[in-house]
Amino acid sequence: MIMSTSRLDWQHSQDALRDEVGRVTALLRSIRDPGAILAVGEWDLAEVAMHLSQGWLGIPGLARGDRSALYDLLPDRAGVAGDSLVRDIADLGDVTTRLVRADPERHLSMLADRIEACAKQYFVDCTRQSPDELHPWLIQGITLPLAAFTCHLLNETVVHGYDIARAAGRRWRINPAHAVLLMDQFFVPLIQGADPRMLVNADAAAGVKATFDVRIRGGSRFHLHFVFDDGALRVETSSARRVDCHLSADPVAFLLVFWQRQSQWAAIAKGQLMAWGRKPWLAARFRSFLATP
């Protein structure tokens, strides 16, 4: 069950998103020559910026029931997954790669303008809807509240802003409060709304029955049980369930480890990830149990 969003959380998530949009667009406009520097995988800096701009086209489009901006780039996707973009999470990587290749724009200032324009319209849309109103998400069969769409955009903007800044050799601070918000209002609703096996690494989690008590520092409400059951995952509010491993995590470190931008061992060495309990050694395997697009 996905929790409802308080008025205060709804305002905080929009404020955080506005702040990150301002930061990332200013960053893009400040980079004069992105060159061919690799930023994420095989994507260079400009391609990551393009991907982020397409996220700003597609995610708000899904929330308003208009997928035309993405279908214009990939006409063969129209109607393939109903009101969503893909049928299965395994298809998402290929489709996002094709989208980036389909749009030749690589001028960073133009991409910044696109992000700003999409953000401006999205915030207008937010004034007309409830944060708890459900909409079809990227993957067919998953519906999420508008608040989760907002924090999905926050996740994309924070993480790819970090990618772009690193590729450009810039220092980039991730606000811990923003990391808590996107985990609380995007990660958790997504896990709760998805098939229990969708976000699990089936090979790594096969046969594993373990409950992790995850505590994100600075997030008083982010104290949840991640329950793995032979390849399935549920997220529950803290209860009397017997815990195998307690995890205390710095929110920024948890975010970067989750998205494989930082080694978990580096975070452990810095005290950003700590474990205790009946089976503390399971902490070293926690990230390997999770699958991400």
Regions picked out by a protein language model, each given a short descriptive name:
Residues M183-F228:
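A glycine-rich beta-turn/hairpin centered on an aromatic-Pro dipeptide
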Residues S239-P293:
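C-terminal interaction segments
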Residues H12, A16, E47, H51, ...:
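Alpha-helical initiation/capping and key positions within long helical/coiled-coil segments
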Residues M1-M50:
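Non-cleavable N-terminal signal-anchor transmembrane helices
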Residues V100-I174:
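Contiguous mid-protein beta-loop-alpha structural module that forms a pocket-lining wall or clamp
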